[in-house]
Structure formats: C-alpha cells, structure tokens
C-alpha cells in the first residue's frame, strides 16, 4: 500500500489550477521521477476539471487509483495511491487536508494562488504519515487488530485439538453435551458447509 501524490487544487470557472502538492516518487527510477511527477499533476488537474462541485469519486488507471474530492466552495483535493490502499482512508485524508487548508489559507488567495505563493506546508507530513493507513487511521488500526485476533483464535482452536482429532469427533464423544446441543452443532455445521460451497 502506497500513496504517491497529495494535491490541493482550485476549480475555477474556466480553469483548474494547482495550489499545493506533495509527491513520493522514491519507488520509481531516478530518471523517471520528474516525468511521473508532472504526469501526476496533469492527471490531478484533469480529474478535478471533469468532476462536479460537491462530489467525491475514484478513478482507476492500471494499478493506480486517483481519489478526488471537490468541495462546493471550489477547493479540491486529489490523492493518487496504489489500488490496495483503502479508499475510505484517502477520503478521510482529503477531508482533513482541505478543511485545514481552508482555515490556514485565505479564500481570496485561492483563485490566483500557485504552489510558489501559497503558504501551506503540511502536505509532505500528511503524505508520509498516511503511508501506513493503520497508523494514520484509527478505524484501519481497529480492523487490523480484529483480523489478528481472529487469526489467533483460529490457530488456538486448531492447536487445542490433538493431531488427527476433529471437533466433530469430540462433539459426538462428549458426555457433557446433551443430545439437543449435539443436534444443534451438527445442524449449524451443515448450514455453514452449505454456505462455503456457494
């Protein structure tokens, strides 16, 4: 999972222009980096130009996803990531960046601003912080912990059973379980196996 670009743009009546951007092109060849960076800036502008105000969307191009959020006040943000990166985290990042940008940079500067004139330097830190979505996003962290717990529980159950033993055999031999509990287990097992086939 990787983020390559984070940009803030202004969608004017006739033209979209870049206000500020940050790039991580370290995974590309040294000689390709400037061309890739230019292409990402061009793609970001094109996507914002073709998006409606007040919209969020994702555009797939080969193994990359471009996530765009255009606010009603014409301020827009674009994140370019690989297709494994969670879209929800991208839109959370865009919302956070655009909100912070709109409070730190005067609205009057947006239509005429450029990367050289806009005083906002947080994009690089956001781009590096959000490289790992689990660290940056609390929901992703909770989901990862739940997945780990599920794996641990599954492994623990398998390790409790002795070699060659099956849970089905243990249930049928059990003296503690009543016949109704055994019947419930068998019915549940059949229903679950039915669902696995589909």
UniProtKB/Swiss-Prot annotation:
EC number(s) recorded for this UniProt protein: 2.3.1.-
Lipid addition sites, S-palmitoyl cysteine: 194
Keywords assigned: Coiled coil, Cytoplasm, Cytoplasmic vesicle, ER-Golgi transport, Golgi apparatus, Lipoprotein, Membrane, Methylation, Palmitate, Prenylation, Protein transport, Transferase, Transport
Domain Longin: 8-127
Compartment(s) of residence: Cytoplasm, Cytosol; Cytoplasmic vesicle membrane; Golgi apparatus membrane
Propiece residues: 196-198
An annotated GO BP: protein transport
The protein's name in its UniProt record: Synaptobrevin homolog YKT6-A
Originating organism: Xenopus laevis
Encoding gene per record: ykt6-a
